[in-house]
């Protein structure tokens, strides 16, 4: 079996899934206290780096995704599958788990 090299450019989501680069977690509190890694809250915001072709309708046609590459999005806390590529964190999630596009 050949080894597979994963990078952002080689990941193509299927269906209505999107691939999101997770924003960096806050390093310190508003009061200036530096947080250890195990105390940091998992971010729920990130930037879309890949988008699937869209959900398939009952008649076989595709429903175009409402989001696009480059959109900053807010998503459900426990949604998707966490993926680490290099030093960056990503999440692969369904479009329905996206709560909002952030301006």
Swiss-Prot record:
GO cellular component, one term: cytoplasm
Keyword GTP-binding assigned: no
Alphabetical GO biological process terms: chaperone cofactor-dependent protein refolding
Record's subcellular location: Cytoplasm
Annotated signal peptide: none
GO molecular function, one term: metal ion binding
Keyword line: Chaperone, Cytoplasm
Pfam families attached to this UniProt entry: Cpn10
Highest taxon of the lineage: Bacteria
Subunit details: Heptamer of 7 subunits arranged in a ring. Interacts with the chaperonin GroEL.
UniProt record similarity statement: Belongs to the GroES chaperonin family.
Function: Together with the chaperonin GroEL, plays an essential role in assisting protein folding. The GroEL-GroES system forms a nano-cage that allows encapsulation of the non-native substrate proteins and provides a physical environment optimized to promote and accelerate protein folding. GroES binds to the apical surface of the GroEL ring, thereby capping the opening of the GroEL channel.
Protein name: Co-chaperonin GroES
Native organism taxonomy: Bacteria, Bacillati, Cyanobacteriota, Cyanophyceae, Synechococcales
